[in-house]
From Swiss-Prot:
Residues 111-141 form a coiled coil. This is Respiratory supercomplex factor 1, mitochondrial. Cytochrome c oxidase subunit which plays a role in assembly of respiratory supercomplexes. It is found in: Mitochondrion membrane. Belongs to the RCF1 family. Its main location: mitochondrion. GO terms for cellular component: mitochondrial inner membrane; mitochondrion; plasma membrane; respiratory chain complex. It comes from Candida albicans (strain SC5314 / ATCC MYA-2876) (Yeast). Keywords: Coiled coil, Membrane, Mitochondrion, Transmembrane, Transmembrane helix. Residues 4-95 form the HIG1 domain. It comes from the Eukaryota. GO terms for biological process: mitochondrial cytochrome c oxidase assembly; mitochondrial respirasome assembly; regulation of proton transport.
Length: 155
């Protein structure tokens, strides 16, 4: 008989979001940061293109835009950090409460699974005892019949 863990048992299967999901969630929280990053990248690309064409004034303008976009991105990042800093502690508390609730639910499922398995084992033991008792009675009956038939033959 192989011993398997109950189906309610899981190891570290917390629904951890992958990297892309985390990035998407953070982008939803602070939409100005990715926007500023995209604008900065666009300004750098335009500056590189104008530099390649030899347009010095446009190149300087695009690099100035890049600095402005980087500053705006940094301000958005710091401002969002302050704003979401207090919310993060509340979110962390909520997450811990959810994890506690999930642990209680798993413990309950684990206990139910163990009780179910115990009931199955007890039922098997009872059937085994009943089968043994029935076999003993049949064997006893067979011996009695054999003894009676031997007694009749001797008479």
């Amino acid at each position: 008989m192989s011993v398997r863990l109950p189906s309610s048992m899981s190891y570290g299967e917390e629904e951890e979001p992958d990297v892309l999901q985390k990035m998407w969630d953070k982008s939803k929280q602070q939409p100005f940061v990715p926007l500023g990053s995209l604008l900065t990248a666009g300004a750098v690309l335009l500056a590189a293109r104008s530099m390649k064409r030899g347009e010095k004034l446009k190149t300087q303008r695009y690099f100035r835009y890049r600095i402005g976009f980087q500053l705006a991105t940094l301000v958005a990042l710091v401002g969002g950090g302050f704003y979401y800093g207090t919310e993060t502690s509340q979110h962390k508390q909520t997450r811990e409460d959810k994890l506690r609730e999930k642990a209680k639910q798993r413990e309950k499922l684990w206990i139910e699974e163990l009780e179910r398995r115990d009931a199955i084992i007890q039922a098997r033991k009872q059937r085994l005892e009943e089968s043994k008792k029935e076999l003993r009675e049949l064997a006893k009956q067979g011996f009695i019949e054999e003894k009676e038939s031997n007694d009749k033959k001797e008479d």
